[in-house]
């Protein structure tokens, strides 16, 4: 038996969660847009998944949290649907293209066939654009990362022959969602003095890239049982590295060692970034780098509490559950998107 508590984080990476009112209010929106049926099971799915919002962005106010919750609603519903094996390759590619068209152009790809998730994505895009005011560069940066993440889902799901951890991490750099999640943190603070050119800084790029590696390393463990259940585990290193390294135990130790190394590198790069930063931008850069750490720490604390990853066969003791109220996500998402 293994424990997710084996992952170690600096104490300042984890804060108490923000208020959860945003989740209830966004659930009402989801029901109004007919993305989910209104019942106990869909609420538990939604709350368990979208409680990530109040863990990722624990220091945000209600207005900020609602924007973040809408973003994560779009992201998780699309991700879960595309990963659920409920649609063929042509349909999943069409879905990605439709969402991309909304995010970039603010238009529906096919006016005669608009799904409810497209309508909600358009609604979210409008609210996010309104939130940033005249800071169009911040909005565009966020849209860029969101589209890249959406377009990474199908290729990653098809990458069934992964057998190298370096190649895998190259894939997961985008597919982990870390870049877009941090970009959302910047969008939530549109009056920042930090220019979007920060994303071109090679040290900041390495800082975020290592954050993506860390999130992936942890998520591989947290989601392992869920992926086995839905037959999506072939791209999980806990599975494919056993062919190269040996036992599950050996692979898990390798991932833990990798995690510890990455955490140290993140801390080192943050220190150097702040040292190099102009004084008038330092507070806002601290906000951004701390946001990265809180997203990573929040991802950890959220995964320990939510039912999304629960499975009686999980190798991790914290995730084992026989609670009859816990429902597998793939039994929910088949009703989400009607193309």
UniProtKB/Swiss-Prot annotation:
Positions occupied by motif NDxxSxxxD/E motif: 219-227
Catalytic reaction equation(s): (2E,6E)-farnesyl diphosphate = (-)-beta-barbatene + diphosphate
Any one GO MF annotation of this record: terpene synthase activity
Enzyme class of the recorded protein, top EC level: lyase
Induction of the gene: Expression is detectable but at low levels in vegetatively growing cells and increases during development induced by starvation. Expression is highest during he ultimate stage of mature fruiting body (approximately 24 hours after induction).
UniProt signal peptide: none
Residue ranges annotated as motif DDxx(x)D/E motif: 79-84
InterPro entries xref list: Isoprenoid_synthase_dom_sf, Terpene_cyclase-like_2
Keyword Lyase applies: yes
GO terms (BP aspect): sesquiterpene biosynthetic process
Taxonomic superkingdom: Eukaryota
EC numbers: 4.2.3.-
Functional description taken from the UniProt entry: Terpene synthase that converts its substrate farnesyl diphosphate (FPP) into the sesquiterpene beta-barbatene.
UniProt comment concerning the protein's domains: Contains several highly conserved motifs that are important for catalytic activity including the aspartate-rich 'DDxx(x)D/E' motif and the 'NDxxSxxxD/E' motif, both of which are involved in complexing metal ions to coordinate the binding of the isoprenyl diphosphate substrate in the active site.
Family statement: Belongs to the terpene synthase family.
Entry protein name: Terpene synthase 7
Gene name per UniProt: TPS7
């Amino acid at each position: 038996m293994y424990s997710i508590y084996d992952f170690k984080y600096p104490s300042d990476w984890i804060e108490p969660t923000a208020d959860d009112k945003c989740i209830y209010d966004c659930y009402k929106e989801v029901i109004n847009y007919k993305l989910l049926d209104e019942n106990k099971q869909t609420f538990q799915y939604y709350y368990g998944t979208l409680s990530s919002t109040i863990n990722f962005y624990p220091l945000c106010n209600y207005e900020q949290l609602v924007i973040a919750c809408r973003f994560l609603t779009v992201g998780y519903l699309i991700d879960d649907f595309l990963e659920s094996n409920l649609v063929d390759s042509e349909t999943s590619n069409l879905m990605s293209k439709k969402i991309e068209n909304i995010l970039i152009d603010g238009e529906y790809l096919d006016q005669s066939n608009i799904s409810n998730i497209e309508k909600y994505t358009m609604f979210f895009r409008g609210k996010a654009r309104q939130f940033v005011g005249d800071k169009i560069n911040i909005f565009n940066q966020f849209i860029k990362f969101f589209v890249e993440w959406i377009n990474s889902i199908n290729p990653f799901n098809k990458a069934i022959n992964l057998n190298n951890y370096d190649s895998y991490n190259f894939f997961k750099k985008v597919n982990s969602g870390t870049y877009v999640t941090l970009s959302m943190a910047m969008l939530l603070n549109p009056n920042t003095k930090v220019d979007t050119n920060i994303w071109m800084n090679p040290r900041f790029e390495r800082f975020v890239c290592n954050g993506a590696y860390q999130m992936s390393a942890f998520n591989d463990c947290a989601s392992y049982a869920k992926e086995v259940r839905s037959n999506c585990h072939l791209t999980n290193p806990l599975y494919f590295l056993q062919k190269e390294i040996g036992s599950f135990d050996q692979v898990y130790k390798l991932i833990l060692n990798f995690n510890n190394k990455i955490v140290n590198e993140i801390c080192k790069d943050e220190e150097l970034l702040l040292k190099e930063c102009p004084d008038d931008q330092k507070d806002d850069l601290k906000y951004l780098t701390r946001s990265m750490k809180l997203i990573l720490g929040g991802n950890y604390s959220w995964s320990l509490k939510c039912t999304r990853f629960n499975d009686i066969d999980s190798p991790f003791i914290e995730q084992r559950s026989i609670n009859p109220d816990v429902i597998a996500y793939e039994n929910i998402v088949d009703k989400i998107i009607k193309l």
